[in-house]
Amino acid sequence: MPTKAGTKSTANKKTTKGSSKSGSSRGHTGKTHASSSMHSGMLYKDMVNIARSRGIPIYQNGSRLTKSELEKKIKRSK
């Protein structure tokens, strides 16, 4: 039993990444709201898909655009 509690606490430590999502989401959405109100938290994959569907090039000078660059382009083409 005590070992279970011990592993539980370590598991909790590990999962703080996942659980902190809901905890820090208030601060997080506040941050992302300023940069992109269309999606509170967009994944790079989502942005690439949106860019593709709108005909925005994902590659520039032979290298992939960063998330923020993609976001800017998507916003401009909105």
From Swiss-Prot:
Disulfide bonds: none
Any one GO molecular-function label of the UniProt entry: DNA binding
Assigned keywords, A-Z: DNA-binding, Early protein, Virion
Subcellular location: Virion
GO CC term, one of those recorded: virion nucleoid
Compositionally biased residues, Low complexity: 1-27
Main localization, broad class: virion
Inducing stimuli: Expressed in the early phase of the viral replicative cycle.
Disordered: annotated segments: 1-41
Family as reported in the entry's similarity comment: Belongs to the asfivirus P10 family.
Function: May play a role in genome packaging through direct interaction with viral DNA. Binds to ssDNA and dsDNA with the same apparent affinity in vitro.
Protein name: Structural DNA-binding protein p10
Source species taxonomy: Viruses, Varidnaviria, Bamfordvirae, Nucleocytoviricota, Pokkesviricetes
